[in-house]
Amino acid sequence: MSGNPASSSEQNNNSYETKASLRISEKKCSWASYMTNSPTLIVMIGLPARGKTYVSKKLTRYLNWIGVPTKVFNLGVYRRQAVKSYKSYDFFRHDNEEAMKIRKQCALVALKDVKAYLTEESGQIAVFDATNTTRERRDLILNFAEENSFKVFFVESVCDDPDVIAANILEVKVSSPDYPERNRENVMDDFLKRIECYKVTYQPLDPDSHDKDLSFIKVINVGQRFLVNKVQDYIQSKIVYYLMNIHVHPRTIYLCRHGESEFNLLGKIGGDSGLSVRGKQFAQALRKFLEEQEIADLKVWTSQLKRTIQTAESLGVTYEQWKILNEIDAGVCEEMTYAEIQEQYPDEFALRDEEKYLYRYPGGESYQDLVQRLEPVIMELERQGNVLVISHQAVMRCLLAYFLDKGADELPYLRCPLHTIFKLTPVAYGCKVETIKLNVEAVNTHRDKPTNNFPKSQTPVRMRRNSFTPLSSSNTIRRPRNYSVGSRPLQPLSPLRALDTQEGADQPKTQAETSRAAHRLPSPAPPTSPS
């Protein structure tokens, strides 16, 4: 039989592009995003200077780190785009009708962007960062969510401690775009008057009557007390758990790797080797550094591997061993050099270079698995004061990615050299990083991200050993949502029905029909070796 070479080539290219698009979709939707069976809108509530933006940014950073696509929509940004110059607190008076119209219009524009993010951009959670202090505004948001079948979870920040409020104004609001080139006294005076404007119409959530059926958490006086009401699902329970662990007290987190090991010298990954001579020198230098810093109540954590324990032993302090701080499990590639892996497992070597974050070693872990494993460490770090974590390269990359808000593309390639300390100091909306080298030579274990200079059509198609089940379709928007028991959508599946109608469907497909249709899709090729 004769065939058309051009047609065959075109089919191959189309096949590759289809698989490539699937991989892009897989990259956007990690295991954690499947914890949300419908998009969720987190709505902040509270007077100005109550830490709403702090909580919004911190919560968003955490959710993105665990793999749930999340984005903050700050209403102040929309307001500043609509009103180029801020003059005084008069803009926020409830009897300023013109300003009230502008503020409502800004809210509607922001909600339109929320809808686009959750329905068109593969977002799973949107954080609506605004005061939302009136029931009228909250009802507007609830109606918006009902129309789009979004779940809603309110986070109200309540604070009546004047010292905390004043500290927040001085730390954050003085540098706000609303106050260019103003002195502290004028800023404080204007902002306190702005708060009074909001107090006139402030209607806190009422768990006993008007708001008893809403899902929310009240955070009182920066975590002194909490009130939780009607949590709907797993992701909301994770949000509550996270918010109950964070604090704003000053502290410093120190991250470093163990001293250089014998396997580092040999270029081998994994294993449980001891320190080299230079590694022991680093341990002594680390002890001297900590003594000079005079850090109060410092806790030291290590993994359960020999090289971190030997590093901590030289410090002359008590330390805790965490098994979940052990290095990433390289499976069959443990105690091998990269050259040996490339020679013995060339396909695996290429697969890991293709997508390092998602790639899982045969019989081992991926970076995505490691992030899941390290979540309890992050929770405990958020609860603690001053801590030194002595860990490993992959582990340290995951921890750094959380504090520095780095995504899956950057995480596996963060530079974490041996004999270097990362000093992390939490600040208002992020983390200040200082890098301290202790002047003890060590081998370089970093591998740069490989560059692929081949045209897409010439790139070999490989099946990834993913850390999650690949999607059967790259179209994440039209994928039917299965709502959990006890938390039905406010308006069940209306967007899907509309889509089916547009395509000429007589009636909405049932779950069984959807499942049968999925089984008719071509199955992906089996992995190169079992996970």
UniProtKB/Swiss-Prot annotation:
Record-marked site positions (Transition state stabilizer): R257, N264, H392
Q: Please give the Pfam families that the UniProt record associates with this protein.
A: 6PF2K, His_Phos_1
Tissue expression per record: Heart.
Q: How is its activity regulated?
A: Phosphorylation results in the activation of the kinase activity.
**Annotated GO biological process:** fructose 2,6-bisphosphate metabolic process; fructose metabolic process; glycolytic process
User: How is the protein modified post-translationally, according to the record?
Assistant: Phosphorylation by AMPK stimulates activity.
Which reaction does this enzyme catalyse, per its entry? beta-D-fructose 2,6-bisphosphate + H2O = beta-D-fructose 6-phosphate + phosphate; beta-D-fructose 6-phosphate + ATP = beta-D-fructose 2,6-bisphosphate + ADP + H(+)
Q: What is its EC number?
A: 2.7.1.105, 3.1.3.46
User: Known SUPFAM superfamilies for this protein?
Assistant: P-loop containing nucleoside triphosphate hydrolases, Phosphoglycerate mutase-like
Q: Region (6-phosphofructo-2-kinase) spans which residues? A: 2-249
The GO terms this record gives for MF are: 6-phosphofructo-2-kinase activity; ATP binding; fructose-2,6-bisphosphate 2-phosphatase activity
* InterPro entries linked: 6Pfruct_kin (IPR003094), 6Phosfructo_kin (IPR013079), His_Pase_superF_clade-1 (IPR013078), His_PPase_superfam (IPR029033), P-loop_NTPase (IPR027417), PG/BPGM_mutase_AS (IPR001345)
Subunit structure and binding partners: Homodimer. Forms a heterodimer with PFKFB3.
Similarity comment: In the C-terminal section; belongs to the phosphoglycerate mutase family.
- What is this protein's record name? 6-phosphofructo-2-kinase/fructose-2,6-bisphosphatase 2
The encoding gene is: PFKFB2
